Design a protein with these regions (language model features):
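Non-catalytic signal-transmission and effector/linker regions of two-component phosphorelay proteins
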Residues: 1-19, 25, 32, 61, ...
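The feature encodes the CheY-like receiver
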Residues: 28, 72-74
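Charged docking surfaces used in two-component/phosphorelay signaling
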Residues: 29-37
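Acidic, metal-coordinating helix/loop segments flanking the phosphotransfer/catalytic sites
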Residues: 44-64
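Acidic catalytic/metal-coordinating carboxylates
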Residues: 46-50, 75-80
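Two-component signal transduction core modules
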Residues: 65, 116-117
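Active-site residues of response regulator receiver
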Residues: 68-69
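Hydrophobic/aromatic residues positioned on beta-strands within the core alpha/beta folds
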Residues: 96-97
Length: 144
């Protein structure tokens, strides 16, 4: 089921918009809730295909993508990251996963040049991590 509704609107409309893609409803709801409490706007997707559609439709508005690596469908989180980097190289993509070993983590980071947040994580860890990514400089040298 696609969730194209942006949550956390209203008085927070000036806050960064984050896309979260995960096929586990409980994890998706947890991340969405934590980010909303931290005053971020959130769009969720339960498949990579949905996430890709949202990225295309909201290009220039989304400031960060959090995606699980292992997801059902014809493409996975790594494929999504590659597509996003071709469409918008300045848009940061963070992998969230609990499925990989430490060696696989390092390989994913080195090959894909992506950041990785390991599940499980505490709410404050997620908030701090997201805040740090939103304040990183983009490849053009401008802070996002």
């Amino acid at each position: 089921m696609e969730n194209m509704v942006e949550s956390g609107c209203g008085e927070n409309s000036g806050k960064p918009l984050i896309l979260v893609a995960d096929d586990e409803p409980s994890i998706l709801q947890y991340i969405e809730h934590v980010l909303q409490v931290a005053n971020y706007r959130v769009i969720t997707a339960t498949t990579v295909e949905e996430a890709w559609k949202i990225v295309q439709q909201q290009q220039g508005e989304i400031e960060l993508v959090l995606t699980d690596i292992v997801m059902p469908g014809s493409i996975d989180g790594q494929d999504l990251a590659k597509r996003i980097q071709q469409l918008d190289p300045a848009l940061p993509v963070v992998f969230i996963t609990g499925a990989l070993s430490e060696a696989d983590d390092r390989a994913a980071i080195m090959v894909e040049k992506q950041l990785l947040l390991r599940k499980p994580f505490f709410p404050q860890q997620l908030i701090d991590f997201v805040g740090a990514q939103l304040h990183r400089e983009s490849p053009s040298g401008v802070a996002r």
